[in-house]
Curated annotation (Swiss-Prot):
Positions contributing to Mg(2+) binding: 38, 104
Family: Belongs to the TsaE family.
Protein name (Swiss-Prot/TrEMBL): tRNA threonylcarbamoyladenosine biosynthesis protein TsaE
Positions that bind ATP: 7, 34-39
GO molecular function terms listed in the Swiss-Prot or TrEMBL record: ATP binding; metal ion binding
Coiled coil: none
Function of the protein: Required for the formation of a threonylcarbamoyl group on adenosine at position 37 (t(6)A37) in tRNAs that read codons beginning with adenine. Is involved in the transfer of the threonylcarbamoyl moiety of threonylcarbamoyl-AMP (TC-AMP) to the N6 group of A37, together with TsaD and TsaB. TsaE seems to play an indirect role in the t(6)A biosynthesis pathway, possibly in regulating the core enzymatic function of TsaD.
Keyword Nucleotidyltransferase: no
Organism encoding this protein: Rickettsia conorii (strain ATCC VR-613 / Malish 7)
Subcellular location: Cytoplasm
Gene: tsaE
């Protein structure tokens, strides 16, 4: 786990992760209420759509979409989903076709998702501090390697990011 000491560091990490994302990526955001999932998504969306983009939390309507240059960002908040099948009523199959998907509260549908996935786990501490881990289960020598190298070599943080690699065929990589 990496400690993000301020809102600014959380923004930096979200934008850093965004730089490695591409169409067809699925990012799962986990954490309690107030952990910063929507804030993290907002920064990813701003990276692709511009700083002045009006970003609305999908808490009440479960889905917001944003047009990036060559794909759409589907931002889901599944907190109020009653059954996993409801995700299909929210355009999920369409979202899987060449778009970037951000899912808050993904636990209810996680069993429906196939790798590769990127999980961002956030835990609120005090004074805008967060604990954060990023886990990916990309296969070896795929996007995961470039994601890890990119995050680890970033000059945006004063300390080196703690990234652990699992050597299993479908690897979990933790920040």
């Amino acid at each position: 786990m990496h400690t993000l000491n301020s809102e600014e560091e959380t923004k930096k990490l979200a934008k850093l992760l965004a730089q490695s994302l591409k169409p067809n990526d699925i990012v799962l955001l986990n954490g309690d209420l107030g952990a910063g999932k929507t804030f993290f998504c907002r920064e990813i969306i701003k990276y692709f759509c511009g700083e002045n983009t009006s970003i609305i939390s999908p808490t009440f309507n479960l889905l917001q979409t944003y047009k990036a240059s060559n794909f759409t960002i589907y931002h889901y908040d599944l907190y109020r989903l009653k059954s996993p099948e409801e995700i299909y009523e929210l355009g999920f199959e369409e979202a899987l076709n060449g778009n970037l998907i951000l899912i808050e509260w993904s636990e209810i549908i996680k069993h429906l998702l196939t790798p590769p996935l990127i999980e961002v786990n956030l835990e609120a501490l005090d004074n805008n501090k967060r604990l954060c881990s990023i886990i990916t289960n990309h296969k070896e020598n795929s996007q995961e390697s470039s994601l890890i190298d990119f995050l680890q070599d970033s000059p945006l943080f004063d300390t080196k990011l703690d990234i652990q690699r699992d050597k299993s065929p479908t690897r979990k990589v933790k920040l």
